[in-house]
From Swiss-Prot:
Keywords in alphabetical order: ATP-binding, Nucleotide-binding, Transferase, Ubl conjugation pathway
GO molecular function: ATP binding; ubiquitin conjugating enzyme activity
Broad class of enzyme this protein falls into: transferase
Name of the molecule in the record: Ubiquitin-conjugating enzyme E2 15
GO biological process: one example: protein polyubiquitination
Family that this chain belongs to: Belongs to the ubiquitin-conjugating enzyme family.
Function per UniProt: Catalyzes the covalent attachment of ubiquitin to other proteins. Has a role in the formation of chromatin structures that influence the localization of transcriptional silencing factors.
């Protein structure tokens, strides 16, 4: 059975990332039988609250990739304004293409077929460095980030330590 264009593209992109891995993350397949499910390890970026942490996540690609974006979900507990309590990452680049019906994002900030898994992961590392508390996915984390930054830092550092212990 021939591979779909989506499968061929994902195989090529996975091979490229594994051959020349950018600093801060590594990727592989959840199961060798499906190119549509990737496991990701993100290393908390230097000079951030998440520094030194090891955060596991999955990237789930739709059959119509790259026309539509994948979904990303942390499987390691993380406390961040732009990560839903269930681990789903909420950043513009992962939102479907087109206009935002709520008017928070420009169409150019959302998913475009020219994006790649690498651009997504770089955006997630940037998100860890600079949380956006203006349109949060986790309202409690955003509120604590704004109103009680010391407690926010303590909670994040505790989860970073836990992520290291889980390795």
């Amino acid at each position: 059975m021939p591979s779909s264009a989506s499968e061929q593209l994902l195989r090529k992109q996975l091979k490229e990332i594994q051959k020349n891995p950018p600093q801060g993350f590594s990727v592989g397949l959840v199961d060798d039988k499906s190119i549509f499910e990737w496991e990701v390890m993100i290393i908390g970026p230097e000079d951030t609250l998440y520094e030194g942490g090891f955060f596991h996540a999955t990237l789930s690609f739709p059959q119509d990739y790259p026309l539509m974006p994948p979904k990303m979900k942390f499987t390691t507990e993380i406390w961040h304004p732009n990560v839903h309590p269930n681990g789903e990452v909420c950043i513009s680049i992962l939102h479907p293409p087109g206009d935002d019906k709520y008017g928070y994002e420009d169409a150019g900030e959302r998913w475009l077929p020219v994006h790649s898994p690498e651009t997504i992961l770089i955006s997630v590392i940037s998100m860890l460095s600079s949380p956006n508390d203006e349109s949060p996915a986790n309202i409690d984390a955003a509120k604590e980030f704004r109103e009680n930054p010391q407690e926010f830092k303590k909670r994040v550092r505790r989860l970073v330590r836990r992520s290291i212990e889980m390795i």
